[in-house]
């Protein structure tokens, strides 16, 4: 028994530690990218209420049920609710954020292609929840 070599165990431990370090570093980098809101992002206040969405741009422009943004720009959504819990979702851009009364939650995105996308509520919010939808219009810059 005294001649038993521990090298295979040490190699196994070293490989596991290396893999765990690599996975941790990749996860940290992904979180940093997702959580970092670009400084030039335009803020849009998103308010959910039974049973529609309102959007207020930095310049005071308000939209109900539809949101117009420009391709290639970053947008920060400040999501809130006037009544009950909602959940703001743009499925095509993997945007999902809870809208809770008395609380402001933030999420950001940067559309990369012109097009139309569904906006919906992903939290049951009452009888007409199924109809709490909107449309995101990603357009060319208007210069």
For the regions a protein language model found, what residue spans apply to each?
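Extracellular/periplasmic metallocenter environments
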Residues: 99-143
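Extracytoplasmic entry segments of secretory-pathway proteins
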Residues: 1-67, 71, 143
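Hydrophobic residues positioned within well-ordered beta-strands of beta-sheet architectures
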Residues: 44, 65, 75-77, 107, ...
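Solvent-exposed coil/turn segments that connect beta secondary-structure elements
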Residues: 49-51, 72-74, 80-84, 93, ...
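Surface-exposed loop/turn positions
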Residues: 67, 71-73, 103, 115
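Histidine- and aromatic-enriched segments that form or immediately flank copper-ligand environments
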Residues: 54-59, 83-101, 134
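Beta-strand-rich interaction surfaces with strong enrichment in secreted/lumenal proteins
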Residues: 64-67, 94-98, 108
